[in-house]
Amino acid sequence: MEAPGSGGGDGGGDPGGDGAHPDARGPVSGPCAAARDSERQLRLRLCVLNEILGTERDYVGTLRFLQSAFLQRIRQNVADSVEKGLTEENVKVLFSNIEDILEVHKDFLAALEYCLHPEPQSQHELGNVFLKFKDKFCVYEEYCSNHEKALRLLVELNKVPAVRAFLLSCMLLGGRKTTDIPLEGYLLSPIQRICKYPLLLKELAKRTPGKHPDHTAVQSALQAMKTVCSNINETKRQMEKLEALEQLQSHIEGWEGSNLTDICTELLLQGNLLKISAGNIQERAFFLFDNLLVYCKRKSRVTGSKKSTKRTKSINGSLYIFRGRINTEVMEVENVEDGTADYHSNGYTVTNGWKIHNTAKNKWFVCMAKTAEEKQKWLDALIREREQRESLKLGMERDAYVMIAEKGEKLYHMMMSKKVNLIKDRRRKLSTVPKCFLGNEFVAWLLEIGEISKTEEGVNLGQALLENGIIHHVSDKHQFKNEQVMYRFRYDDGTYKARSELEDIMSKGVRLYCRLHSLYAPVIKDRDYHLKTYKSVVPGSKLVDWLLAQGDCQTREEAVALGVGLCNNGFMHHVLEKSEFKDESQYFRFHADEEMEGTSSKNKQLRNDFKLVENILAKRLLIPPQEDDYGFDLEEKNKAVVVKSVQRGSLAEMAGLQAGRKIYSINEDLVFLRPFSEVETILNQFFCSRRPLRLLVATKAKETIKVPDHPEALSFQIRGTAPPCVFAVGRGSEAVAAGLCAGQCILKVNGTSVANDGALEVLEHFQAFRNHREEALGLYQWVYHSHEDAQLARASQGAPDEDPQEDDQPDSALPLLSLGPQLSLHEDSAVVSLTLDNVHLEHGVVYEYMSTAGAKCHVLEKIVEPRGCFRLAAKILEAFAVDDSIFVQNCGRLMAMSSAIVTMSHYEFHNICDTKLESIGQRIACYQEFAAQLKSRVSPPFKQASLEPHPLCGLDFCPTNCHVNLMEVSYPKTTPSVGRSFSIRFGRKPSLIGLDPEQGLNPMAYTQHCITTMAAPSWKCSPAVDEDSQGQGLNDSSYGSASGAPSQQDRGLSFLLKQEDREIQDAYLQLFTKLDVALKEMKQYVTQINRLLSTITEPTSAAPAPCDPSLVEETSSSPPVSEESEVDRTDHSGIKKVCFKVSEDEQEDSGHDTMSYRDSYSECNSNRDSVLSYTSVRSNSSYLGSDEMGSGDELPCDMRIPSDKQDKLHGCLEHLFNQVDSIHALLKGPVMSRAFEETRHFPMKHSWQEFKQKEECTVRGRNLIQISIQEDPWNLPSSIRTLVDNIQQYVEDGKNQLLLALLKCTDTELQLRRDAVFCQALVAAVCTFSEQLLAALDYRYNNNGEYEESSRDASRKWLEQVAATGVLLHWQSLLAPASVKEERTMLEDIWVTLSELDNVTFSFKQLDENSVANTNVFYHIEGSRQALKVVFYLDGFHFSRLPSRLEGGASLRLHTVLFTKALESVEGPPPPGNQAAEELQQEINAQSLEKVQQYYRKLRAFYLERSNLPTDAGATAVKIDQLIRPINALDELYRLMKTFVHPKAGAAGSLGAGLIPVSSELCYRLGACQITMCGTGMQRSTLSVSLEQAAILARSHGLLPKCVMQATDIMRKQGPRVEILAKNLRIKDPMPQGAPRLYQLCQPPVDGDL
């Protein structure tokens, strides 16, 4: 046995290979060599003895740790442990008989130490110790057989946060680092140890010469321990793995470094690859283990000697010579495109290859596989190994931090209580140190309360709190010590930053990356060092300087800590070696830059980090549940989920679902990537909860269908021209079954083009139409494309009494038309072939990536043309036309009243007014015409960019290139990370999207993000030459020679409209509207008083008419006004706060739902010193029945006013007088004074002084009412009527004056332009908000994903937030006003226009419409320009999910902000116009930041008010975490925005374009609706969205930091936004020269680049 044993030892132990032959020629080599060999063997034997003793001591220490840290603590806190779920049975299962094992090993260690006393020597004997204890080692049988059960239980317990935290705290107090080895690692150590003994004894036997006294005992001990292990199944399996590793290592000659069995558990992959390094290309055998990659040279067979033949009997019959090893922790892998030949491949052309970078030594080499399949196998294995390692580490770090933070929070609250009084101000030398505690007092207190059981645990806990940033030494000089050293909680000195080095580092890192790459004077750039160029690097000290200059960090130490955090979390690394970040001149590089350098778009898909899965073209269908099912069945066909059948007449068929269509997603779940069984389960779950379905169904842009040509009746309606469109289809008809849907455009009939024809030309091809032209339509329930179409159809039906018939018809008609046999009757009938153009298609791309947590995430990115935007623009134009018509009528009436022209100035004034009124009349006619154009427009469903000026048309009121960019992210919900890491380590991987046998479907997280891109709203119209008179007149008035056309077109509205003029015009309009509403409300109070008096005075004959008709009827002169137009001064609850109650029957028309322009009436109670002060004193007697009445004999003597009626009368009269006071205040104000001044040349009844004196009439009227109350109640109604008549006349005079002033200051030439730009902006805003609203109502919106908040909670929170604080609309402009004249004009236009959006309000109503398919929302416009109200009609399901305030009718306020930054440098001396352009941008940004700050304050108050902190300390910590972290992030972003908007002197140029990503993140976190604009809506805005989406994925969805730019690049060049370029082929929109690096990296390739 000696020869092979020692031979094996030589091969493994002599790196030089010199000792490979001595035994073979032993007799000849002489005594000297033999002695040398013997001495070497004994030296190695001593090493093995030391290892056995050392590892045994460590093992006993581990067992003691498990006993003291876990078992003893659990026993000390029995009640607490049971409450958390650690029952006695659970503890027994987890730890089994580990204490018995400890007792055995204490004795075993004592015996080993006795044998090897005082220090191990090579002559010591050890074999007998093992033989003595071999029977006692049977104690392992129970432990090993229970082990699998224990691990299963641990996974379940780890799902309970309280248990997970308790187990982590046990580990912490025991002094072990919680992130090193998880508990399951410790529980595995007994099995690993018992399996290790045979390996150690085998090594000892090798090194024990035959003549050694211990030789026989060691051989016996080896066999005995093998027998012990083979008797236990679990250890047998473990032994086999370890033996395989040991055997493999024994076949590698010259092995260096630690043994495989010490650091690895299994071989993952092996194979031969070509390795290119240092100019050589060689074949090498590679072995990939967990944690290690080894490569060897194959040793050629040596023939001749007996020993050599034996040594060739190994793996694959060959031997290896060790050539190198790389710890996978410091190894990076990079794919290489086929055909590449570069520096690392030494000029060799690479095929099926990849690069491996040993970052510890900064050495690169290239590997090449024989085939592409083999390459993929290696890359997959390398990535799997990396993900297992990273997810384990990240998960453990996150869990440990949570536990320590919660523990710190709990202890802090306890220490702050008066009983404990540990935290206090303390004296030190001559100073006082505020709010601190002493280390030794802290440890003593922890012992006293039972938090720890011994002093060491207290020190461990203190050190953990210090390392995790919860406490610190008051001078930051000491670690935690159990001494009289002062420490302070960071909460008390404001230095606590929650989790900044863990999760928040992700968003901080992404933010820093974007800012650094947005600089015009880059900090990150290519740098030369020692004749080598390092690409995209930054010296550590330069980065520290920059962080300090920007205010991100206050000290260099803090900046270094941030740099270390960035390196530790995969953002950047040292370019040469794996060293920590230092404040030195060493170079560091962002991983994301490495991913981008030297790559072309072709090799992106081979990367395993972020890859494209599928391109889709689809249509979104909305299918509500029916009584029994959804009306369709699915099947699996070619691994795709396909519609098997659709029920005739079902809601699914009505939505346009057809058999054979592929389904991509159901309610945002990407079912096409799931097994079919799971898809059925998902459908059942949705049906059980009665949820409507949102299906994404594959479709084509154009398709040809065959519609049966029945001679009896048509089952569809066609309208419109060029192209004709399907107006409606009959539900359940054969046309629907054939695939005809409302809204489709008809391009061809039977192969003949009809795209430029009308509906009649299409219908002529159908027999039914030719036979019965007038009555060709069948009896169907019609399904329309939009609600407007449905309304139009109802209106054209004629008399209203026919409507019920229409509803009855379908019920009787449907059975006839839906019968199956009817199909067979017409089997041979003719068909008409229709080629159709589908509208509202969604272009999408599906991507996937592995997140930092090791989960597979899927992203569906889509662009959607906003539905109904043309019709919405038409409705806005109609509202403007109505507004203008009323204005023209009122002004016309006024002009007619004053026909006498006295002076020349009167004549001029009259003439100007006439001209303006004529111009407004032409505008009204145009708006009506444009509205009709837009309503009939169907295709294309969006407006393309146009660079040339053109005659004004309806499309000029619609946004250009407006697309909603949706990003839907889905991934499995995270399980507790310890459990997750367990399943990865031990091979029980849960399916990422699949069925868990214990839980049914794995729960998934779904989130939808929405950003709109568009061209900035603009005015690009030229005066028409050949228009009709109306259009000509309009254009003449807009661009008349007097108006100076060139200057108007060259400059924007903010330049042309003076701020003062805009303000005074708005003031006039607001006053006009306020007067109108105040008068209306006053009349409603009068109505209530009259009604009240009529119920008190029984004899109706004697009572006066309760209410004069003139008081109630609406005056025709008052424009229809949104009664909530000035929302900031209204009470949003929808019910006015009044101080009296009205019965239900009175409520109907009492006007109590009316919203007032004045402040809430709740303060009326404090106004009792008014006219009613006298009556309130006499509240217990009736005025009508009192002795002072004088005419008492006219009344029945028992006439009394009940006390409840008295109170109502008091309230009504008080409100009436308050309203009168309010009207007086409005009429005497400065605005009215200015109006009189402006119109002094127009002859009116009164001057300003005479007008003010009219108030005396109303004072007299009030006195009269007081007298009536006390002396003559019968005349009270007539006194009130007199007062109201006076007030009404007073108000009418005031309104007339305002109308004249308005007419004078209205610039009719600019109003058209304002309307066009405003209309474009409002349409985009409404469509964006509506998409985000629907996402929130479907519980898919989540702007808080990085704080692990569920989409359901985030959506509900956002809905409550907007209901309380309004909607933040964030417009981001990338226009270049300094270099492009047109873009400066655009910016000046939209600055004015967006401020006007704040006057718009949104409200909600329920939609009771079932004759329109695939529409959740439709819009209605009410009000005037100054108080426009958009009403969102929502279907019942979504309406029921609105916050109760919005359901009740309250309106939402808009807060519009515009941040603008040109993507071009402003370095150097500016050209003349540039300075003004830069100042314009700064002014816009400053105003917007102020508005954002106001909104943030409201939001902060809203959340803090709702966050009543729980009493439980653990729950408090979580709650504070959820609140403080987002607030900290918002504070930081706001600070950054201030540095961009108000830069220090001379620093403006050094800030770059960082404002763009920072403002996006700030508004995203505030829950804003985001709209990004550039000159055309094509290039800059779409790239900005790709960047923002990649940043969101990294911040909230675990995209690896190194993949941020890679993801941006793929989404930009291969994502759905390339469709926008395809739709605008002739439009050029290049990126500005000198754009920052961030915006140049991902530009689409120029022609010829690829």
UniProtKB/Swiss-Prot annotation:
CDD domains cross-referenced by the UniProt entry: DEP_2_P-Rex, PH_Collybistin_ASEF, RhoGEF
Region annotation Disordered: where it falls in the sequence: 1-33, 793-813, 1022-1047, 1099-1129
Keyword annotations of the record: Cell membrane, Cytoplasm, Guanine-nucleotide releasing factor, Membrane, Phosphoprotein, Repeat
Gene Ontology biological process: G protein-coupled receptor signaling pathway; intracellular signal transduction; neutrophil chemotaxis; positive regulation of cell adhesion; positive regulation of cell migration; positive regulation of substrate adhesion-dependent cell spreading; reactive oxygen species metabolic process; regulation of actin filament polymerization
Composition bias, Polar residues: 1030-1047
Residues recorded with modification Phosphoserine: S314, S991, S1186, S1191
Domain spans labelled DH: 44-235
Self-association and partners: Interacts preferentially with RAC2. Interacts with RAC1. Interacts with AUTS2.
Its job: Functions as a RAC guanine nucleotide exchange factor (GEF), which activates the Rac proteins by exchanging bound GDP for free GTP. Its activity is synergistically activated by phosphatidylinositol 3,4,5-trisphosphate and the beta gamma subunits of heterotrimeric G protein. May function downstream of heterotrimeric G proteins in neutrophils.
Protein name as it appears in the record: Phosphatidylinositol 3,4,5-trisphosphate-dependent Rac exchanger 1 protein
Organism of origin: Mus musculus (Mouse)
Lineage: Eukaryota, Metazoa, Chordata, Craniata, Vertebrata
Gene (name only): Prex1
